Amino acid sequence: MIKVNDLKKKFVKQKNKKEKMEFYAVNGVSFEANEGEIVGILGPNGAGKTTLLRMVAGIMNPTSGDVQFDDMNYKRDEIKIKKSLAYLSGNTKIYNSISPYELLRMCAEFYEVKKDEIDNRIQEISRILEMDKFLYSRIGNLSTGQTQRVNIARCLIHDPKYYILDEATSGLDIISSQIILDFMKSEKKKGKCVLYSTHYMEEAENICDRVIMINHGNIIKEGTPAEIRKATKTSNLRDAFFALIGSDNNEE
């Protein structure tokens, strides 16, 4: 289980030549994501999704609040957490001059996967993500979708318990997107915990057990897709999203 407790992140930006202004990109967010569950993090650009996920992944320090992974927290168990965690964003950069196979071997060694298990693990992941045809090709020659599959493979190599995926299918072709979505569903069936942000409402509706909608750094609605549709009297998550975002903006 991932438990997020009152996370806040404050930034300072220049208002004009003389004045600076403080603002909260994430303002007191709390939620839980359970084993065997995909929880979608939804919101417009600038809502605070990426900042939130970077704090949950331990890449960015919060101004206040904390995150628990079962009985672990970053203050006491940072190394243990990061060994059991996978984080991926849509714009993650990887080495262009080596092959996916070489990259996966390097990542496996970094995560201390047993040497006699590395090749079998790489072949298993290659099969799951349909990478066989380009496993030994130069990464710099791969398509965007193929490169993102390599990124997913890099996250999968150490068999993590927790996944934090930030717009993992953004800009991908339909085949690559579906492979990644199928992968997430299979990891959920294994009891893994998945946090997943996306701009694609249809995708979220099909794959997420629960969704958390964020605007201006605050949670504005949380529930199953069916619960949110019912609460907003809409027939799909896209319409529910616009109803909630519009209502939240009108209250300001």
For the regions a protein language model found, what residue spans apply to each?
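Conserved ABC transporter NBD signature motif
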Residues: 65-76, 80-81
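Conserved ABC ATPase "signature" region
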Residues: 105, 109, 116-134
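ABC ATPase "signature
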Residues: 222-223
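Catalytic Walker B motif of ABC-type/P-loop ATPase nucleotide-binding domains
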Residues: 163-167
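Conserved ABC ATPase signature
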Residues: 138-142
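Helix-to-loop junction immediately C-terminal to a conserved catalytic motif
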Residues: 57
